[in-house]
Each structure stands twice: as C-alpha cells, then as structure tokens.
C-alpha cells in the first residue's frame, strides 16, 4: 500500500456511486484526511443531487458541483468529432473524452482549496486511472494522486458492499434487486459493464440500456431532421441555432426515441486486457453521420483521405488518456485547419436504429453536377483525357506484368 501520511486535504472526483462513496469514507478513516468532493455535471442528470446529499451525509463540508456541459461539448466533444474519431472502428469515446475535463478541474480545485492531493475512483484494471493521472501530471507535474483501488485491501465488489454496510453507506440496486452494473453517463453517452456482461456470449438484458428504446420497439415512421454546420461544428437543428450542449441533448432525445446509438463491443484496454461493455451514444451517432456527410461535399479528396488515415491514431490518443499531449494538439491543429470550409446542412432520417443521410448542401461545396452528369456536360469534362490518365497509372503495373511474363 502506498503511504499518504503527509496528506491532510484531498479533492475527490465524486459521483455519489458505490465506489467513490466508499473511497470518501476510506480517505477519512484510513488517512484521516479532510475530503473536498467535486462532481462534474456533464449531463448525467439525476445523479447530481443524490451525490450532494450523500456527500453531506458523509460529513463533507466543501462540496463542488459544477455545470460543465457547455465546456464539455464545446471544448472536448466537438473538437473530437471534427476528426470523426472512433476507437477500434466502433467506440465513440464517450467515457474517454470526459476524463480530461474532470481531471483538469480536480487539479484546479486542489490549487484553489489548498489541497495536498487529488483522488479518483478508477480501478487498477481500467483505462480511467491512466486518463485521470496523465491529465493531472500534464497540468501539474508535482500533483499528488491517490488511487485507492491500487492501495487498499479490497479485492472485489463484495468487499466493497461489506465495507459500505459496516459504515452505513447506502448501496443502490438495479431492477433485478442486485448490486448495480458498473455504469458511466454524460451528455455524450452512457456505458454499462460488469455482471452478466462479463461473459461476451451473454446477450445484454434489455434493462441494461439507459438511454435508448430498443430499435425493435421504435416508431414505425421515420423522423426527419436537418443539422447545420459551421467550421466543422454542428450549430443548428432544424434551422434553429442552439448551443453545443443543447444541440447534443436534443439529438440524444431524437436518437433515444428512434433506438439509435446502441453498441455491444469488446475493446482492447490500454492496460492490456480486453473488456466488454454496452454503450449508448444516440446523439453522437447522429452527429458523426451528419459530419461525415457534410465533409463529403466540402473536403478535398486528399485532405479527406489524410484525415481518415490519421483518425485511428487520434482516437487512440484520446482513448489512452493523452488529450493534453503535444501529439494530440498537433493533430488537432491539422484537423481544425481542414474544417475551415466544412459548413452547410445535412438532412437525415432516423428510423429503428438507423441514421439515413438523405441530402447535403453547402455554399462551399466541391461537388459539381456539371462534371458528374450522365447528360451533356457541355464540355466541362473531356472523357478522352481519361485514357492518358489510365495509361500513366498503369505504367508500373504493365512493367511488373512484363517482368513476370519473362520469368515464366
């Protein structure tokens, strides 16, 4: 166990859930430290007031609950979506992108309150411990970080439940009357892990899903929407200008009702193991489809292809916790440059889990119907030019083929 005897005051990232409530009590009883709680409102909704009440019940005097929804979407989610970031081709990074903002505020609140350290509830098996701590050290190289899951003697959630009962800490239960799934939620997504989901062959029970109706139960009629973009960011919905957080919240509602954004995946954690989770990202799934659609008519081919080549590396940096690294910032500058003319409108239909693009338009479109028409293009494109183009590109292939023929 690491020694933290010199720690007198700790800022704890506190959700009000089982893990962080036990950590709070552990910091008080084992370290004798004064605890300051910080709860970020990233759009998780009803979690917040119970977190305040539980912190008060546990004797906390300094309770910080901050509405960071606009900052979260504007400064973290939207920059990531300019890159069309997907980790391992499927994961929209809903948990990953929230950690840098939470850790940033932990470091700032520690400085504001004169705390000796910060603490988080991430386990020693997961990615979040890395994300929190890499961010903290990037912003304050001298910060002290307490990670109780790596220090205490608890080995399982059963141990946690026993500790909670011994210290009169309320334990919520899910609809099956058991200890809850491990869950995370913010304005971009919700996730569920653990219990039956630890078997990758087991179908997720329907009650696991927090954000969406089943696609099979979604309306039999499509919902049509239009999203407006400016410099790569969504700025309007159905012609109405709205703030980043408001827009994402509205897309979440639309996606929820139409069963959009569910994924069941097994991912490769940064720490080396595979994990299975059920993620729901209704608004983000719609936004990604719309952003790619507007890029399709406003981005040059070379720029678009380069972005797609760089995207996996960019997504991996976010997944692994390197939001504040120089390489992520370098890639962000390139991505942001590519978005200068990414503006216009995209029309979509939402239907039973599907996001269907039905139109896109932009004053800065590179699409030319005069060039692609099957009718008379009035000299806009001379098809005879294609012969020389093909001949030059075939030169190396013909040379290789000739050598193979000579070699028999």
From Swiss-Prot:
It is found in: Cytoplasm. L-citrulline binds at residues 91, 96, 127, 131, 182, 191, 267, 279. Pathway: Amino-acid biosynthesis; L-arginine biosynthesis; L-arginine from L-ornithine and carbamoyl phosphate: step 2/3. Its main location: cytoplasm. L-aspartate binds at residues 123, 127-128. It catalyses: L-citrulline + L-aspartate + ATP = 2-(N(omega)-L-arginino)succinate + AMP + diphosphate + H(+). Pfam families: Arginosuc_syn_C, Arginosuc_synth. Its EC number is 6.3.4.5. Signal peptide: none annotated. The keyword Calcium does not apply. GO terms for cellular component: cytoplasm. Keywords: Amino-acid biosynthesis, Arginine biosynthesis, ATP-binding, Cytoplasm, Ligase, Nucleotide-binding. ATP binds at residues 13-21, 40, 121. Belongs to the argininosuccinate synthase family. Type 1 subfamily. This is Argininosuccinate synthase.
